[in-house]
């Protein structure tokens, strides 16, 4: 609609560009014979058999068909009543047209006016694209006019047709607890109700067959009572000719990874996770599908009790390039995983497999954050694991990061384990002993502490093992004035170690340490 001056109004800043694109595409194909959408000559618009997009052309024709139900053109003002006809044979298509008309008229232009070609170029609106898709969905699906009684106008709802699935659909909606039937509720952290069956008229016989096959497969993989059936099923597949076997395995992999919900339902189930691990390294194509699913859902799997068991099999089943993809994800999520109860365990397991630059980067990341990770109830396990691995650079960096905190760590449950592992490491021991040596008061206090007394015992035994006689004598002498008090409470454990293991040894062996009196 033009304004009083005969000019089209300026586009509004709140335009809907996506819907505009859909409308312009419609107009583009309608103009294939140099006709404007809404012109009377447009009734023969699909007579051109060489039209570049027949489905879109059909959609436009369907618009015209319903717009003409009241002898109105798709751009006439009277068209606003089109959805008030409750007896219209196809309300969804009418709604789609009205949505198209609504956004096309956003700047008070009729859908057939030439000004519509540049309507609101700054206008994003996915709902318009949805409206356009609805046009294609309902318009003449099987060469029938929308509104005919045949139910074939609807596309087949092929829910689990494995012939049409691939790894391309991994980017599914956010994960929610599975609503698949749980054949054994106790074997999964989720439980739910079965999927409601679709209307029978929407489901073809082939879909029923595929759906039943997938349902049976999932049942075998997640049910404790049927798990042996799944193993037998794979053994039978191994007897097939190579090509047929590969085809069946690819079908299985496609079915299990086509949606995020199905894959995570299996991966987070006790038996489902075990079944997925069995599938690795049976076929290159199957390995690729499973790896892509693991890669896409990496963090969710690493933080799940059963899902974390899939990471190492996935790493071992693929080539170096794909391995590094998981290595990189591990590095990126290091600190997030380290603070999770399951994530810290999964991270430690993966560290046993990682090689190359990402291993060093993870070590560096943990070392740089060791001052707070060591006090974290879960992060401390990651720090301890790196200390056990005895990487010289990482261990030295951790010890330097913890300098000044060893007494405080020694008197906390999780921190005491970190200090003990530092004492047992050739790359961190000196830093710990230096701090203990410089504060006699705290050294004595540790002997009666609930957790610190174990650190004192460990320090004494390490110095004996490493034959550091002068230094060991120095530490014992600092405790001697307090032996009486140590006979009561937790100090008696340290006193027993000194009397039974240390005192007699001090004067027997030559000193082999670098320390001097």
UniProtKB/Swiss-Prot annotation:
InterPro entries (alphabetical): ARM-like, ARM-type_fold, PUM-HD, Pumilio_RNA-bd_rpt
UniProt-annotated location(s): Cytoplasm
Pumilio repeats: 258-293, 294-328, 329-363, 364-400, 401-437, 438-473
Annotated spans, Disordered: 33-57, 69-94, 107-130, 175-201
GO cellular component, one term: cytoplasm
PROSITE patterns registered for this protein in UniProt: PUM (PS50302), PUM_HD (PS50303)
Compositional bias of kind Low complexity: 42-51
Domain PUM-HD stretches: 148-502
Purpose of the protein: Sequence-specific RNA-binding protein that regulates translation and mRNA stability by binding the 3'-UTR of target mRNAs.
Protein name: Putative pumilio homolog 21
Protein's organism: Arabidopsis thaliana
High-level lineage: Eukaryota, Viridiplantae, Streptophyta, Embryophyta, Tracheophyta
